[in-house]
Amino acid sequence: MVHIGDISSSDYKIQAKEVWRVNPDGEIRDTFQKLYNVFEMKEVEFFEYYNKKKQDYSNSELLIAYHQEEKEILSRMPEFPFSNIWIASVTAKKLPSNSVLHLGIRNSLRSWNYFDTQETVTGYSNTGGFGIDGSLSTVIGAALCHPDRLYYCVLGDLAFFYDMNALGNRHVPSNIRILVVNNGLGFEMKFPASWGYSIANSIGVSEDNYVCAAGHYSSPDLIKSYVYGLGFEYLKVSTKEQYLDCLPKIVSNEKQDRTLVVEIVVNSENEDAALNLIGSIMVDESNVAKAAIKKAIGKKGINAIKKMMGR
């Protein structure tokens, strides 16, 4: 694995046999505990050098297997409920050529990563320290630097409120289209695999009230009034039909004279259902069997077996 980063907030380890760190600082930073080589250079120089040595992998068995599996997964895509995942599924491929997509972290980033855009569309996500970090500020700055390109920003309601002051800048350009997927809470902290859910569950309180900020800014006119007050164009949708009606405007290649903000109202139940659907398109049967056994024997049974096995 080629590692070009510095500080990482990753809470998991990528299982690579070797890690090559490429960075002008030349420092030894063994993030993944598999560091093998350090290249004291810019990543552009590194990849330019190895790109000249490239081989033809078009007939690689591994690449062919990946393509076949991708094809199989796409053929099994279900109909998703109205959610960030559904929005991505009907929008990603329609983004205009040479446009730029900025994604809010966690839910938006994950949802849109499931679907391809055109090859000429560039994607970014300002993850920062993996909190709700300035994606709105980032896209505004980028759009100012490149007025000839169309910029999209897809983010959740909490990320929008966190960085909404950026829209008050008098120089916000008209080549930005912002999609605010408003599910009324911090969904990332709600679903069972999350830390927020685990913490709330362990102390017997509602994750909605104490972790997810459910019901925050519940006025249906808050974003609308703010956006109108700044002189931008505002659209609001709460069904698939309404979204599909305004989709041509969202993905239009024509220049507009005002920044466009689309508030998309979804609910957390649909977000959760869509995530479960897309995560179970292809299931490893061995993992299903293990989960069933664990559920059947319970935690005490698992601990007893571990004790018998000396683990």
Language-model features, listed with the residues they occupy:
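Thiamine diphosphate
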Residues: 114-311
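Short glycine-rich anion-binding loops that position phosphate/pyrophosphate groups of nucleotides
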Residues: 1, 6-9, 25, 106-108, ...
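Active-site diphosphate/adenylate-binding microenvironment
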Residues: 67-146
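Redox-cofactor binding/interface segments in oxidoreductases and associated redox assembly factors
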Residues: 3-4, 21, 103, 153, ...
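A short acidic, often aromatic-flanked loop/helix-cap motif at beta-alpha or helix-coil junctions
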Residues: 27-29, 43-50, 109, 131-132, ...
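Glycine-rich, acidic loop regions that bind phosphate or pyrophosphate groups
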Residues: 1-67, 170-171, 184, 193, ...
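Generic structural signal for well-ordered, non-membrane alpha-helical segments
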Residues: 43, 59, 63, 80-88, ...
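Short, well-ordered alpha-helical microsegments
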Residues: 9-12, 47, 88, 109-112, ...
